[in-house]
Amino acid sequence: MAANKYAGTQTEKNLQEAFAGESQARNKYTYFASVAKKEGYEQMSALFLKTADNEKEHAKMWFKELAGISNTKENLAAAAEGENYEWTDMYESFAKTAEEEGFHELAAKFRAVGEIEKHHEERYRALLKNIETAQVFEKSEVKVWECRNCGHIVVGTKAPEVCPVCNHPQSYFEVREENY
């Protein structure tokens, strides 16, 4: 990732706070939109969502200033590191504190979410390995590939360069999973 030119400054702290605040606002407004929609307030729901989208863009602007966005390979590595911290340190620490304070059900939730974060880390590391070994769109074994745009199916070791049905690029193909 690019160097953070604000490292060690109050401005860096301000950018981090701005990023956190905008990110939290985005999520809150998304949740508020769901409530408004359930209560029959479609316009209010839409306005919460519109504002949430604005907040997302504000957060992105500050995160870019912090040099937090890079290429996919580096983004996957950073995401895996973040998920690792969450499941190995953060949620376990939160669970211990909750237990000490008598909040046993909350402690169990913290640990359960920690397990989910562990799976997120594993997923990101597997995807990173696919990039590092050039196994994103080509596998050593025959796979069923599906175009995420039109649903076209291809059986083989490699996704086509272009979907023969909708002409979308190879990047739209994924290994098909049927878990139903």
What are these model-derived regions, one by one?
Residues 1-180:
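Non-heme di-metal
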